[in-house]
C-alpha cells in the first residue's frame, strides 16, 4: 500500500468563500469548499452518485441543523461535507478527503 501525501491543489485566495472549486488530484476530481461561516475548508469527491455526474463543486454550500452540506445541482440532495453521507438517502455517500491550508496553499491528503 502506498503512503499518503499532501498535494497542493490551489492557493487559498483562489478558493472563494461559500463557493466550490474542482481540482484534479491523483486522477480524481475533488470538490473544494471554503465555508465563510465556519472558516474551514472541505474536500470531497466531485462525483454525485445519485445523478451519476461530476458536479458537486457546482452545488450550493449550506447547513441543515448543525450539519455543513453541499446540495447537488442536479437533484438537490444534500451531502454532509464532514462524513460524506447523503441526508435524504443515507445509502449513498461521497468520499471525504483530509484538507489543510499551509503557507497559503490548499492541500489534500491522498
Whereabouts are the PLM-identified features?
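N-terminal pre-ligand scaffold of iron-sulfur
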Residues: 1-67, 93-110
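Short cysteine clusters
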Residues: 48, 72-75
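C-terminal structural segments of small proteins and small subunits
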Residues: 76-98
Amino acid at each position: 500500500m502506498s503512503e499518503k501525501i499532501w498535494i497542493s491543489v490551489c492557493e487559498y485566495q483562489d478558493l472563494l468563500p461559500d463557493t466550490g472549486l474542482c481540482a484534479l488530484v491523483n486522477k480524481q476530481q475533488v470538490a473544494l469548499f471554503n465555508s465563510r461561516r465556519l472558516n474551514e475548508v472541505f474536500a470531497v469527491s466531485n462525483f454525485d452518485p445519485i445523478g451519476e455526474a461530476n458536479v458537486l463543486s457546482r452545488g450550493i454550500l449550506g447547513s441543515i441543523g448543525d450539519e455543513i452540506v453541499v446540495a447537488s445541482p442536479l437533484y438537490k440532495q444534500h451531502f454532509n461535507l464532514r462524513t460524506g453521507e447523503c441526508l435524504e438517502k443515507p445509502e449513498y455517500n461521497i468520499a471525504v478527503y483530509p484538507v489543510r491550508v499551509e503557507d497559503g496553499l490548499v492541500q489534500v491528503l491522498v
